[in-house]
Amino acid sequence: MPWPFSSSSSAGSPTHSQKEDGARSKPTSWNDLLPKPDPPLHAAKEWAPVFLTSVASLAAFIFYQSRLRRFPTAGHIQPDLFRKRTLLGRVTSVGDGDNFHMFHTPGGRLAGWDWLRKVPTTKTALKGKTIPVRMAGIDAPEGAHFGRPGQPGAAEALQWLRSYILDKRIWVRIHRRDQYDRVVATVYVRRFLFKKDVGLEMLKLGLATTYEAKSGVEWGGAEEAYKAAEAKAQSKRLGIWNGEASTFESPRAYKTRTNETEGKKSEWFSGWS
């Protein structure tokens, strides 16, 4: 008989001690005591940050190696990058009408160059840190070197090139490394809103000839444009084409002649030794 002042629900519900007895009496197997494996989704959530961090680190390393790594000299450029990469840099010196030195600035202003990172300006600071570049597809008149007299038009070509690219940002599409450890490349500089092919501009003004060789000439895909510009400047008698055709000597012919002359001199002196 239930207590008159108690409710029927409380009378029918098990007591705390009865619950404990029921819990103790529930059979337990060995498998129930083993730790339950995490569901696949839960495991994926735990490992996802580690995986994503590894992938991001690898991607950052690859991006640095391919786009932000600075090449101090031509010797630091891997052979497999030639004909594939365009390097951004600043011209630090112009030594002749068709070659110069550049300081590689990968990433440009986005990587902090010119506002967080400065390009050195002194010869001492630049020593061993620049890439010598030989412009592809053209040959400017030879200046006075090693006791050789300079060609007509050499001073004009050098002066123009200095005014056009010295201390300027340039884009260099690299083709190969030559026997003098220079990078043979097609060179571009921004003029107002457009990028100009520097070699092509020199040909248009009659400041250079197309490179004369039977094989191994690097054109950068612009052979037709270069030869057309040369022919047009020649027809207008611009620059080096302003003199008599009968007395004109191309830079290639000049180098061949002077090399032969020096070779004969060395043979003559060796006969007296």
From Swiss-Prot:
Pfam families: SNase
Chain positions recorded as Ca(2+) binding sites: D139
EC number: 3.1.-.-
Membrane topology designation: Single-pass membrane protein
Entry superkingdom: Eukaryota
InterPro entries with a match to the protein in the record: SNase_OB-fold_sf, Staphylococal_nuclease_OB-fold
Transmembrane regions listed in the UniProt entry: 47-64
Biased composition (Basic and acidic residues): 257-267
GO cellular component: membrane; mitochondrion
Compositionally skewed regions (Low complexity) per UniProt: 1-16
Localization: Mitochondrion; Membrane
Enzyme class: hydrolase
Domain TNase-like as annotated: residue spans: 85-243
Stated family: Belongs to the LCL3 family.
Name of the molecule in the record: Probable endonuclease LCL3
Species per Swiss-Prot/TrEMBL record: Colletotrichum graminicola (strain M1.001 / M2 / FGSC 10212)
